[in-house]
Amino acid sequence: MARRSWLMILVINSTLGSLGCATTPYKYSRFHVEASSPEERQTVQFEYGKPHRGLDRAAWIVALPSRILPFHPKVNSHNLSQETAEKLEHYLEANDLTDVLVRVNQYDPVGEWQRMRENSRIAFGWKYTFGTANWLGYTLIPSRVFGGDYYNPYSNSLSVSSDVPAILITEAAYAKDIHSQALPGTYASINQFPVLTLWRYTRAVNDSLGYARHQDDWELERETCATVFPMLGIQAALGGHTATGLVMVLPSITVPIAMIGGAVAGHTVGQTVIAKREHEIESRKSTRIPLNSSEAETDDSESKTQLVGFTESPPDEKPKGRP
């Protein structure tokens, strides 16, 4: 038991210790050839589940525990505000992820299966093994009731249950990570294994922080530290397992203790990073240095933003309203 506790502490420290330290220029992604005219540009699709009083009430009750440890009342609220939708849409558009379907409080197993079949990015073998397992989880334990915000790389869809921009952009960052891989099916499947899955969470959180800093969006950066860090701490404490899965192999009291410990560790790290960044921001304000600490020093011939992919012009950096 003592050995397991030390291993858990080591995993938590190594995972959380790598966050909040981004210093390289933020890289916007480019995965498609740029449209020749604004009319040809693909826009982000949002699909919404239909209201159901009884189902929505049950979902709200089931989600109560999940709102406690991340210290945010809008986690698994099964609602998406216009402001949050616009922030998510801007991230997806800025990183050329307009092919990602956003499902807001929606349950559509038939549609998910069809999208998985049509997803040419993922190899056949991965789609009908790991992809099918993911589809079964979506079908039998629907986020429409049990909550959860997650990107499914096999169907290329993002399921949304929370009204928290930091959480949604972190999951969207995983979509960016998947799109940038030469072997996305292999990468996605490997990252489903316990412990290994922490790697993709860490990369996504760091991308979210880098994006927030480049956009000079202190509210988003602060929310990432305050809300996503505790959630990542829980993941690290569970070793990347789900709480349900661990209950089957560990004493039932061990799982909640691990979750609380991970959340407290994540909260502590998050508040430490917030305090450090607030000090930096105040110092920069007094000396008129840009808030974005990750901005590279460039000359007239260089762009301040690094891009991944085809185009050379950085995407629009001002949030756009949804049509």
Report each predicted region and the residues it spans.
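Active-site recognition of the HExxH zinc-binding catalytic motif
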Residues: 163-183
